[in-house]
Amino acid sequence: MKNIKNLILLSILMFSVSCSDDYLDVNGSSANPSSSTPDLVLPAAQKNSADMLYDADKLNASGDSFNRIGSIHAGVLADAGDRVWYQPEQQYLILNSTYSRIWENTYTLTLFTYNFIETFEADGYDNYKAIAKIMKAFHIAMLVDTYGDIPYSEAFGRGSNTQPAYDDDQEVYDAIYNELNTAISMIDNAPPGTLTASTDAMLGGDMDEWKKFANTLKLRMLLRQVNTGASLAAKYSELISNGIGFIDATVSVNPGYANQANQQNPFYTVFGLTPGGNPTNNNQAARGNEFFVEFLKDSDDPRLTQLFVPAASDGEIRGIPQNNYTNAFRSDATSPLGPGLLVDSTQDLQVMLGSESLFLQAEAAFRGLIPGDPASLYKSGIAASFSELGATGATAYEADSFNNKINWALASSSGNELEAIITQKWIAGGFISGFEVWMDRVRTGFPSGIPIPVGAFSPIFPSNLLYPTSEIATNSANVPDQGDNAAFDRHTFWMQ
């Protein structure tokens, strides 16, 4: 970890020598790090990946990120009644400035660094380039999910085109899916010794695990499209016939997180304590949505006490209805995030949960898209979630429940299998992979019954964000027109 941390510091110094203020100058931003090499840049790129998931706006310390807004719109995260920290999100007030840093910094920080690796001209870096392709696909898919059409084919010209055209969202999805296949092929054909384990802060240079990660991302992308009517049977078949398999443990990144300023795990930076031991603003604000907390309480879910700690005022675990700013739900009367989420400032940063992989497989098997026993995969997903959060009793929780969103036999007898899978995925990833459970809610409508916040500006929950003001200012000729209802109209191709 110390070696990776040193590599990151060196790489950041190289990249920061001539950073540009032009945020979407992936075509020209961060200059051309001609003195750097993929082995130096990879750990810095992986650190940037972690930041995009949990702390994309580090300079302003806002905590804006894909996963935080996802947790809010999935009905998981709420705001303490005396903090008013997430009020615009809970009101469904979505402007061109809303969470704009997740667009801007995904391009300038994350995609730029991976693109540098992917296009590096010297020989001997095949596995680095394959990893870069996989991670570019990971982030670009999130941009498509969030915004629809995005710059892709012209987005990486290194200064030759600072106003890139927008590509059709489905065409981008198809292109990055193919890039995942190309990355797998590159790994299969890479000469031995083309990657040093100490320079890979995610999977320690285990290229078989990188192939599994790519295959699991492919499954995620295919299930996104399950309602489109597209004929994807051949792609599902290839997922199995390639013999790669799927991830069976959480994919995490840890470049050497430490309890020092600017070196903490970004999730902990946002929701935990400062290096001096003081609660952050988000720590004092972040609470469970009442609907989420009550579901766990009603089902005697052992994960409850890992996700939350008792309220300071009376020792009860209590959530808060979203957008409810009253004294009854002040911060000391509601439950902060618990030890299953906030371990310490050096904890690994989850990129993709092992439980998500199992729930993806359970859904695909239930739909008859891949072989496998959905019941077994579902129960394994619950067990993995318990393990990820440090809880025990997964088997009894599922088997003894009278709730058909928990007990598989009851779900099967009532035709509720899909909602059970998505609901358990929602619990497992609600605070960790908030973006994924938001997209699942858009795609499936599950979990059912999540209330629209009182005072929200729309009777339906958001599906998308708007193109940033900065993009409209610098690339207006190419930015697609968006209607007044664009944040709610399910305009990404797979949502329609």
What are these regions (language model features)?
Residues C19-V76, A122, Y236, L337, ...:
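Membrane-proximal, proline-rich intrinsically disordered regions
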Residues F386-Q496:
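C-terminal functional modules
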Residues M1-G28:
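Bacterial Sec-dependent N-terminal signal peptides
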Residues S35-D39, A80-T392, A411-L418:
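Structured, solvent-exposed acidic/aromatic patches
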Residues D57-F66, L307-P310, G393-A394, S433-R443:
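Short coil/turn segments at secondary-structure boundaries
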Residues M1, C19-D22, A137, I176, ...:
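Terminal processing/anchoring signals of secreted or surface-associated proteins
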Residues I12-S16, L53, G429:
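Residue-level signal for alpha-helical transmembrane segments in multi-pass membrane proteins
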